Amino acid sequence: MLALDSSRQQQTSYFQDVHMDPALVDPFGFQMDNLGGFGQTSGPTSAPTSYYGTSPVYADSQLEPKTSAFPPMPPTPPSLPVPYSTEPYMSGLSSASGPSIASASSSAIGSPYSCTAHTFPESWVDTNHGIGLPAAVMDEFFPNEFMGSSLEADHTYQRKGPDDFVEHSNFSANCGFFLQSPDQSHLPVAENYSADHLSQTGLAVSSPMPNSGPHSRSVSIYDRRSSISSTNSRRSQLSPAASVADFDEESKEKGRCPHPDCGRVFKDLKAHMLTHQSERPEKCPIVTCEYHVKGFARKYDKNRHTLTHYKGTMVCGFCPGSGSPAEKSFNRADVFKRHLTSVHGVEQTPPNCRKRSPGASSVKKVSDYCQDATGKCSTCSATFSNAQDFYEHLDDCVLRVVQQVEPSEVINQQRLAEVDCDEEVKKTMEKHKLLDAAGDVDDEPEEDDDDYNELNLQLRSSKGAFKSNKANSSLGSRPIMGNHNAVTKNGKARATISKRRNNRDRYPPSWGCPSSSMKTKKRVLCVFDGQRRLWKDEMMLDNEFEVRLKLPGGAGDGTNREAYITDLDVETLKRAEGVLSANEDEKGPWLEGPATHFMGQPAKMLPALSHTHEDVDIDDLMS
């Protein structure tokens, strides 16, 4: 293999007798007779002490005879420019020759070692003979079993299969030869290739100084096709899927809550951080609500909760039958808003953002919905041309009504305060372990949709199931009297049926109440004189015969909200007024005990009853 002379000044250059003539242009016209003299002298004993401190690493006797006849030729031009080549600098080389045959700067063939050309064509494949021609052409002149220069510390190109030379691992670890770093001042430096640029483009800048430690064989790259273009290929771009994945990971880390006890990921991290405040600034305007004390972190959540306190009927002015018994009515604002979104195509406006530009729903007119659509707000009697404008108006309108203090609410507060201060009530509460403690209430209102009339089984807290109890912790251990005085212990909150008004015509078929027969309304009339009940009766009327009457004074709560009453209610009140407005002669004397006859003069004479406690058969009387 490669051996060095006694001094660097006595080294023989690659081109001793060959001059730069046009014959180099034609690879097949190249004179191969003098190639034996191109190599360096093979005297290993004449190497200077600065290069070898021990016996030579490679011996010529370890190679096959046919390989020893040829000098070591540089392999395919390396991927690095000349300034970063792993070949040691030799003073005998001229600046025109370069470290390889094809790198002559004055030749007609363009050299791939030129500093201005940083990419190599595909024709520069691994040929093992350094000329840059395919192995099929140069196979008759150069054997393919050639091993690279011993000074290539990186082992860039390796043969596939068993090698015919001794591996590095067979030598001792203290082979201890050191190469002197080449003087970079003699070599041309590329302007655009710095160490930083090479590190960014993925090209490793390797020092020509091999490691003095144990040599390990590098991994062979012959498992795939190797080429200069693949070695010097630029850094591949990330695929769109990988870019999206990296972006998602980056956005997920940005949205992660920094609170040590939380650590969850939120889209709106700024809004979530408000929930970690010690005090929630937004309070519910209803004094009796426990969120008047707890509060909310965001105004949007407070307004959404306040809408649940609305007590009234909201009529959709964009559905058919508005103003008639067939109108679509709601008793909850959130359910009404879902109806506008799902049925009338209203676009929801996200919180803390601007209103959207007018769309198709904002251009529609009232007549486009249905023939009898009014577009009227049942709360404030305002008229709107489309459902989108009414949807944006609904929150402010309902919140204004809810936040108004009703006169009856003031009276209720006074009465409740008197009960809270009563000592007897406190003793009773303590006796039954009903402490005045606020229970946990979910921030989200329960899902309720009048479009689907179903019986929802929900696990509610004891405060929701039993409104008279103010704590749910004590119910878990309280014994409950069941049927036939059987004592059972309630360990968990019992499942209660949340029944809405529109569910009253959806009873199970086994009850014998088909929905077709559920068309009547029942009015129960109870007339009292102080604590004495004077009258109680029931009246049934089919919905088809019910007539709605508009109250002239409205709802009477200080707003312009319209209110309605049926003709049956009017007739029922007339009967009550007839009883209460009767004089003493018309009422007659008050009889203690159960009554044996109807009030007033009967239309039919009653049979004589021997005993006052006997029951009266109503069917016999009415027959």
UniProtKB/Swiss-Prot annotation:
GO terms for molecular function: zinc ion binding. It is found in: Nucleus. Residues 227-239 have a biased composition (Low complexity). Residues 202-256, 468-493 are annotated as: Disordered. Its main location: nucleus. GO terms for biological process: regulation of transcription by RNA polymerase II. SUPFAM superfamilies: beta-beta-alpha zinc fingers (SSF57667). A zinc finger (C2H2-type) spans 255-276. InterPro entries: Zinc_finger_trans_reg, Znf_C2H2_sf, Znf_C2H2_type. Transcription factor involved in fungal growth and virulence potential. Negatively regulates antifungal drug susceptibility via transcriptional inhibition of the expressions of drug efflux pumps in a crzA-dependent way. Under the treatment of azoles, both zfpA and crzA transfer to nuclei and coregulate the expression of multidrug transporters and then keep normal drug susceptibility in fungal cells. This is C2H2-type transcription factor zfpA. It comes from Aspergillus fumigatus (strain CBS 144.89 / FGSC A1163 / CEA10) (Neosartorya fumigata). The lineage of its organism: Eukaryota, Fungi, Dikarya, Ascomycota, Pezizomycotina.
